[in-house]
């Protein structure tokens, strides 16, 4: 077939596809007018930097996993709070029936505006999540947790019955349905997951996550959250030092790590992250126990510097802006700043 004939045949095929499936169903990559990946801040600038784009990507699936009480739900709730602060709508599928509204409120979540569902079965949870995403109105949805998404057959069966692979099949089907809807609506879906140990593993890590392998494939970002140290005020434990490893990242280089403080009852210490990152990148100067910024003293000791920044939010915002500018992290866009390219589902 001659070159002109091939071009004409291709144009006819593209016109037919656009007519049948809608404009934009097929396009040349150079003609793609989609904006750069937008992000929802996590509440920790260290984690935002590790993610490479300033937060959790919009329109993607995120998996947050780790041991018990490591800070998984706290990270997710901070993302919810930041999405709401930008004018977005958030939903929380509480499959564990363990959401604490008071704690969520302390992290900045607008509990009056948060959509919450406590489903009876895994099928119900994922169907509700899918319907909310397809509405196109959500900015972020959290499913807590994958391990608690119990298939209906298991709930209705006897205690000793075997239900091999039911949850994995349920997750695989749900993620196949949701992926395109998430991209179309710009909704970020966070799946919180638990760790299990594989029996008989001689080499490598025996740890694995629940719900089969589908979530590992469909997730654009996977975060491994670990508690590495207990923060103490004298002899009293006041929080945890947390390390997050970005074990998978489809929107930026993976395998970066971030460390930050989680204060009991207060969540991620934003000011603590600013101090750590500011010192690391030469924006805040540390001399002995004193912290200074632009010639002004922030305080003696990290706790005093943290309190000073908490009392002076404009200064904290200025430091955050300088850190992001130095590291080339663009400011996160608000949910309605750029509309996603419509895709027929």
Swiss-Prot record:
Residues that coordinate or bind ATP: 66-73
Protein name per the record: Protein RecA
CDD domains from the UniProt entry: RecA (cd00983)
Organism annotation: Frankia casuarinae (strain DSM 45818 / CECT 9043 / HFP020203 / CcI3)
InterPro entries: AAA+_ATPase, DNA_recomb/repair_RecA, DNA_recomb/repair_RecA_CS, P-loop_NTPase, RecA-like_C, RecA-like_N, RecA_ATP-bd, RecA_C_sf
Keyword match DNA damage: yes
Gene Ontology cellular component list: cytosol
GO biological process: DNA recombination; DNA repair; SOS response
